[in-house]
Each structure stands twice: as structure tokens, then as C-alpha cells.
A protein has these predicted regions:
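Acidic catalytic loop of the alpha/beta-hydrolase fold
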Residues: 73-74, 119-123
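C-terminal catalytic histidine-bearing segment of alpha/beta-hydrolase fold enzymes
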Residues: 129-181
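Serine-hydrolase-like catalytic core of hydrolytic proteins
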Residues: 1-25, 131-141, 147
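Short beta-strand/loop motif that positions the catalytic acidic residue
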Residues: 108, 113-116, 120
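Extracytoplasmic/secreted proteins, especially bacterial periplasmic and envelope-associated proteins
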Residues: 4-7, 11, 36, 40, ...
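Loop/turn elements at helix/coil->beta-strand transitions in domains of secreted/extracellular proteins
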Residues: 23-25, 61-64, 109-112, 138-143
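Primarily recognizes the serine-hydrolase "nucleophile elbow" in alpha/beta-hydrolase
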Residues: 7-80, 96
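Mobile cap/lid helix-loop segments that gate and shape the active-site cleft of serine hydrolases
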Residues: 70-104, 110, 137
């Protein structure tokens, strides 16, 4: 799947003038499994072997990553049985590290915005905390927003999420304005 995401970015790069895009201002955003994929997109490079398919003369690197409720370290245990099964069946023991964005972080990665609910029972918010710590350790610009009282879908089953969805949207817009200017 990451191969398809990387090919999509290369396609945007190759067709930027046709789509009226600035190829130097392409970012990626994903939620849950999409958060995992954009995190892997932001941390992987051509040496990982995932740049296959069309537009190989183009870069699959993005300039900013927004990952919401992402899985970042598959070596950790998950309370959700489906994620645990996917780790072993979908990736296999040998590929767990390779499929973990946290293992690919280098100092030349794009800026990251990580957003995670503190009541997420599907993907523990520690996944974003660990990724944030690794990014900071490697001097990658990173921002972590833990949404209080929010579950995996950023809703608040018991009260109000803080920051609110409107505030989260503004945080995202500010991040994009800063890094995709």
C-alpha cells in the first residue's frame, strides 16, 4: 500500500503543471491507517525499496506530514486484537520494523504534526508520543497535540474534546501555512 501512496505523490509531481500545483508545496495528511501511511511516506526514502511503478523520475518526498491517530511503532502491543492480528498476518514478524515509521526517522524528514485522542482505545496515544520523541531526537520539526477526552475518531464520549474539532482544524491550517509557504 505504501508503494501506491508514494506513486501517487510522484504522479502529482509529474503532473504538477497540468493540475496547477506547486510541486514544492505538497504535504500529506491521514487518519488512523492513513496516519500510518503518511507517517511512513514522510519517513521513508528511495533506499527503502518502496518507490516502484510509474513516475520513477520524480520524488515521492512530501514537505509536511499531518498524522492523526497513527500507528507508528508496530513492535508495541495494542489493546485491539485486530491490530495485533494485522501486525503478524499482514506484515509478518520480519516486516514489523520495516512497516513502523518510527524506525525510518532521519534528520532530513519533513515537519510532522501528530494529533491523537487521549481516550483512543484502538491506537494508544503513546504511539504519537513515541513518534514525537523520535522526531525531536532527530531534530525534525514536530508538533504533538493530545486531544483530551477524545477517542479514535476525535469525538468525546463523555463531555467535550479539548481542543475542539474547530480548533484542531485551525492547528492544521496554521501548520500547513508555516511549512508549505
Amino acid at each position: 500500500m505504501i508503494e501506491d501512496v508514494k506513486c501517487a505523490v510522484r504522479s502529482l509531481q509529474a503532473n504538477a503543471s497540468e493540475y496547477n500545483l506547486d510541486p514544492n508545496r505538497i504535504g500529506a495528511m491521514g487518519v488512523s491507517a492513513g496516519g500510518h501511511l503518511v507517517s511512513l511516506l514522510g519517513t521513508s526514502d528511495a533506499t527503502d525499496g518502496w518507490d516502484v511503478g510509474e513516475y520513477l523520475d520524480q520524488s515521492s518526498r512530501v514537505r509536511a506530514v499531518i498524522a492523526m491517530a497513527p500507528v507508528t511503532d508496530l513492535s508495541r502491543s495494542f489493546p485491539n486484537a485486530d491490530i495485533e492480528a494485522m501486525k503478524h498476518v499482514g506484515f509478518g514478524e520480519d516486516n514489523v520494523a520495516a512497516a513502523s515509521p518510527i524506525t525510518h526517522v532521519t534528520s532530513d524528514d519533513p515537519p510532522f504534526l501528530l494529533i491523537h485522542g487521549d481516550r483512543d482505545r484502538l491506537v494508544p496515544y503513546e504511539q504519537s508520543q513515541l513518534m514525537y520523541g523520535r522526531l525531536v531526537q532527530m531534530n525534525v520539526p514536530a508538533q504533538l497535540v493530545i486531544v483530551k477526552n477524545a477517542d479514535h475518531s476525535f469525538t468525546a464520549p463523555n463531555g467535550t474534546a479539548t481542543p475542539t474539532l474547530a480548533e484542531i482544524n485551525q492547528i492544521i491550517l496554521d501548520f500547513l501555512a508555516k511549512y508549505l509557504k
